[in-house]
Amino acid sequence: LHLVLKYGTSIFVIENFGDKATEKLWNGERTRFPSGLIQRAIDKLNMLSSAHTLEDLRIPPSNRLEALKGKRVGQHSIRINDQWRLCFRWVGGNAHEVEITDCH
C-alpha cells in the first residue's frame, strides 16, 4: 500500500500504517481520536509525508523528534501534543508503520 501525495515534481510517501485509526484519519474518515487532537494530528501526518529526510522532522523544534527505546526500538516519534505522539519507522526515506499513540 503506497499513499502518495504529489506537489510539483516531488513525491512524498507514507508506506503503511501501524493501526487502522491512524489510516482512517489520513483518509478523512471518522476516528476514535479526541476531537481536539484531530487537526493537529493531520498537520503532523502531512509534515511526516512531506519529509525528505528524518532530519526534516526536527523543524519545528516542538516536534521533538526522538528515537524510541524499549519495545519501540527502531521507531521514532514526533509530538502531536503533551499526551499524543506520531510514531513510525523511517526506512529508505519513507515512513512505515505510522501510528498515533497515547503515551500516558
Regions found by a protein language model. Give the residues of each.
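Arg/Lys-rich, positively charged N-terminal/basic patches that mediate binding to nucleic acids
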Residues: L1-K44
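Glycine-rich, flexible loop/turn motifs
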Residues: V13, E29, T53, P61-R64, ...
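Amphipathic alpha-helical interface surfaces
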Residues: G18, L37, A41-K44, R64, ...
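A short, surface-exposed loop/turn module that caps and links secondary-structure elements
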Residues: H52-H76
